[in-house]
UniProtKB/Swiss-Prot annotation:
Forms a heterotetramer with UvrA during the search for lesions. Interacts with UvrC in an incision complex. GO terms for molecular function: ATP binding; ATP hydrolysis activity; DNA binding; excinuclease ABC activity; helicase activity. Its main location: cytoplasm. This is UvrABC system protein B. GO terms for biological process: nucleotide-excision repair; SOS response. The UvrABC repair system catalyzes the recognition and processing of DNA lesions. A damage recognition complex composed of 2 UvrA and 2 UvrB subunits scans DNA for abnormalities. Upon binding of the UvrA(2)B(2) complex to a putative damaged site, the DNA wraps around one UvrB monomer. DNA wrap is dependent on ATP binding by UvrB and probably causes local melting of the DNA helix, facilitating insertion of UvrB beta-hairpin between the DNA strands. Then UvrB probes one DNA strand for the presence of a lesion. Residues 31-271 form the Helicase ATP-binding domain. The gene is uvrB. InterPro entries: Helicase/UvrB_N, Helicase_ATP-bd, Helicase_C-like, P-loop_NTPase, UVR_dom, UVR_dom_sf, UvrB, UvrB_inter. Pfam families: Helicase_C (PF00271), ResIII (PF04851), UVR (PF02151), UvrB (PF12344), UvrB_inter (PF17757). GO terms for cellular component: cytoplasm; excinuclease repair complex. A motif (Beta-hairpin) lies at residues 97-120. ATP binds at residues 44-51.
Length: 663
């Protein structure tokens, strides 16, 4: 295994000081962790600074920490915030590295085999390698991940044992180093020097680690001894400085040595023979022929190249696991005494629970029809109970914790006071009879004060009809439906904040990135229709959308008071009472949050003049104009990727492809 660097403490850098009930929450969380408490809940109201509290806890308990979010967008936002809080420590990002992913599948009803098709994002792949190498080299590591962290990753022991350790003065021939690099899946490329490659110039070997994007390393030999090792700029070759120790981790997470590979191949062949015998005994000759052809090809590739497309489907044999045994995941790269924080746990824990079943249903079909060996079923995400077995200490973070989290612990730390002094909004319940005219009057009041309104409906038809009616009444309104992609969605939020329109209508306004301080009214139609968006948790989340404005107000239109409505109203009133008392005791006057508009939407536009599909008539452009548009979009795509807004970058990429097809 790799010798870790000397322990370096987490050092939090921030211009803010804990305020409101953050100090109490931080102290309680830290005391409980240091006291050995396994699970606890940080129940933080919207806008109370939960991420800052999490950062304070990490800096004080000083443990390697895994922060899990329920999608890439949220993970990217958290990654950016933690990078700012901990500039001197290793803050890493680990999400699925696919821009596009079509899993391998088979549909028996139409005899359709769908081959795996994917597009790997090179930047995210680099960040994944950076995360695993940091975990093996140091302890001051925060990894912000999506639920993809519970998917199979390869053995951390094999990954670490395969690493190549180099020092000046070390006796090793140049050719031996080259062979070692090939063994850990580095490719020789003397022309196109990129991640996961090396090039050779006489007695000089330059290596580009899989975890880097700008800096590579030059290893200079004198005979069969390393003379010196330098860090260099990958593009220019300019020397940055000398290093006294270089560890090169494998270029792929699925790696094994030659001896282990032969053992793995023998196991694959034995399983193949067993499955072929089963198919033939059942008269499934087509399935047997299909399985033999595919598996023997993969075996040949593994033997000759040490790798094959879909190698993860043989991970059980390569890792030496028993049938049904859980795969190695990112969690196995952490030391035993690490901390897990689950952001928006009411969403994330549900995802963790659901991943396994969906994966197994698809793969079982591939096994039954001879596309994969049964061992492919063990290349899978963890079950929830297997995830739980990795938990040493965990903090669930949510404004509305789910039933699962509540069943895991009685330790609940509340964070209700906002640093800005803002209160949870007042709530009115009004009858549905005449609700549209009543709502129109409320909207006009907000428009007169240059404030915005959210309206949430239960059906697409209701949202569309209401949008049409309000437009007829002269209201500037837009409807945000599920088909709207990231680029358009961020454009809509930006326009709402700028006052291009005043009212936003949607079915699910709980998604990330739509906390708008200018919104002073949230109207909930059909509030008495129980369901996912009208249960206590959904209502509290929706109510929170009005908690960023000092004049925040919520109107529920309903003909009866449901239990969910009553509990949401009671909980909001309880929090509001606590907040009022705190403000009064400390002489705090609530203030609307001031939030930079561009910061809200990342970089969907770098300026008003940037190019988007909605605004430009590309078909009427000349070829030269389209070429200019493509260049501008490529620049925006790179900027999006650098800021980790990969969904937006993918949108830009798709638009660029469309434009290229026009020529």
């Amino acid at each position: 295994m790799i010798d870790k660097r000397d322990d370096k403490p987490f050092k939090l850098k921030s211009k803010y000081k804990p305020s409101g009930d953050q100090p109490q929450a931080i102290e309680s969380l830290v005391d409980n962790i240091e006291g050995g408490e396994k699970a606890q809940i940080l129940l933080g109201a919207t806008g109370t600074g939960k991420t800052y509290t999490m950062s304070q806890v990490i800096s004080k308990v000083n443990k390697p920490t895994l922060v899990i979010a329920h999608n890439k967008t949220l993970a990217g936002q958290l990654y950016g915030e933690f990078k700012e809080f901990f500039p001197d420590n290793a803050v890493e990002y680990f999400v699925s590295y696919y821009d596009y992913y079509q899993p391998e599948a088979y549909v028996p009803s139409s005899d359709t085999y769908i081959e795996k098709d994917s597009s790997v994002n090179d930047e995210i792949d680099k960040l994944r390698h950076s995360a695993t190498s940091s975990l093996l080299e140091r302890n001051d590591v925060i990894v912000v991940a999506s639920v993809s962290c519970i998917y199979g990753l390869g053995s951390p022991k094999e990954y670490a044992d395969s690493a190549v350790s180099l020092r000046p003065g070390q006796e090793i021939s140049r050719d031996t180093l080259l062979n070692q690099l090939v063994d850990i899946q580095f490719e020789r490329n003397d022309i196109d020097f990129q991640r996961g490659c090396f090039r050779v110039r006489g007695d000089v070997v330059e290596v580009f680690p899989a975890s880097r994007d700008e800096h590579a390393f030059r290893v200079e030999f004198f005979g069969d001894e390393i003379d010196r090792i330098c860090e260099i700029e990958s593009l220019t070759g300019k020397t940055i400085g000398e290093v006294d120790h270089l560890v090169l981790f494998p270029a792929t997470h699925f790696v094994t040595n030659d001896e282990h590979m032969e053992q793995s191949i023998a196991k694959i062949q034995a399983e193949l023979a067993e499955q072929l015998q089963l198919f033939e005994s059942e008269g499934k000759l087509l399935e047997a022929q299909r399985l033999r052809q595919r598996t023997e090809y993969d075996i040949e590739m593994l033997r000759e190249m040490g790798y094959t497309s879909g190698v993860e489907n043989y991970s059980r044999h390569m890792d030496g696991r028993s049938p049904g045994e859980p795969p190695y995941t990112l969690l196995d790269f952490f030391p035993e005494d690490f901390l897990i924080m689950i952001d928006e746990s009411h969403m994330t824990m549900g995802q963790i629970k659901g991943m396994y079943n969906g994966d197994q249903a698809r793969k079982q079909m591939l096994v039954d029809y001879g596309f994969r060996l049964p061992s492919a079923l063990d290349n899978r995400p963890l079950r929830r109970e297997e995830f739980e077995s990795h938990v040493h200490q965990i903090v669930y973070v949510s404004a509305t914790p789910g039933e699962y989290e509540m069943s895991q612990t009685n330790t609940i730390i509340e964070q209700i006071i906002r640093p800005t002094g803002l209160l949870d909004p007042e709530i009115d319940v009004r009858p549905s009879m005449g609700q549209i005219d009543d709502l129109l009057g409320e909207i006009n009041q907000r428009v007169a004060r240059d404030e915005r309104t959210f309206i949430t409906t239960l059906t697409k038809k209701m949202a569309e009809d209401l949008t049409d009616y309000l437009k007829e009444m002269g209201v500037k309104v837009k409807y945000m439906h599920s088909d709207i992609k990231t680029l358009e969605r961020t454009e809509i939020i930006r326009d709402l904040r700028l006052g291009v329109f005043d009212v936003l209508i949607g079915i699910n306004l709980l998604r990330e990135g739509i906390d708008v301080p200018e919104v002073s009214l949230v109207a909930i139609l059909d509030a008495d229709k129980e369901g996912f968006l009208r249960n206590e948790r959904g209502l509290i989340q929706t109510i929170g959308r009005a908690a960023r404005n000092v004049d925040g107000h919520v109107i529920m239109y309903a003909d009866k008071m449901t239990d969910s409505m009553q509990r949401a109203i009671d909980e909001t009133a309880r929090r509001r009472e606590i907040q009022i008392a705190y403000n009064k005791a400390h002489g705090i006057v609530p203030q609307t949050i001031k939030k930079d508009i561009r910061g809200l939407i990342s970089i969907s536009k770098t300026s008003h003049n940037d190019i988007s599909k909605e605004e430009m008539d590309y078909e009427s452009m000349s070829r030269g104009e389209r070429k200019e548009a493509i260049n501008a979009l490529q620049k925006q795509m790179q900027e999006a990727a650098e800021l980790l807004d990969f969904e937006l970058a993918a949108q830009m990429r798709d638009l660029i492809l469309e434009l290229k097809l026009m020529d």
